[in-house]
């Protein structure tokens, strides 16, 4: 019973769970959910679904990064002061997620061909940027897994 109480009061299990949720969410959204929806839905419905899913996904991503940072053992976020470079991947994930959250899409309905062409160009640019930011976040999340493993192997 004592061992369970010590574990429950330790940051490590919460840190591992939040990091695992972050990595799992990124992998699932990037490689499973988007691919299946793209293949199964007509384009109009796929785009409508993505407009609803992605903002929630990016908010969850940022929230999980914060949760991962504040549960870093042994001293919460202050633990990064001892190993400042361990925070770099999480900062990268947080920044890329926040940038994706900040992208605003104009949903106004217009029939002006020039405005439609400009909106399509803006959407294409934002979509490409979002894909690249998500790839950077995924690489940074895996990178953090290796820095965390190194810290655990060296006794934090």
Curated annotation (Swiss-Prot):
Pfam family, any one: DUF4149
Membrane disposition: Single-pass membrane protein
One cellular component term from this protein's GO annotations in UniProt: membrane
Transmembrane regions: 131-153
UniProt KW Ion transport keyword: no
UniProt main location, coarse: membrane
Entry-linked InterPro entries: TMEM205-like, Xanthocillin_Biosynth-Assoc
UniProt-recorded name of the protein: Xanthocillin biosynthesis cluster protein D
Encoding gene (name): xanD
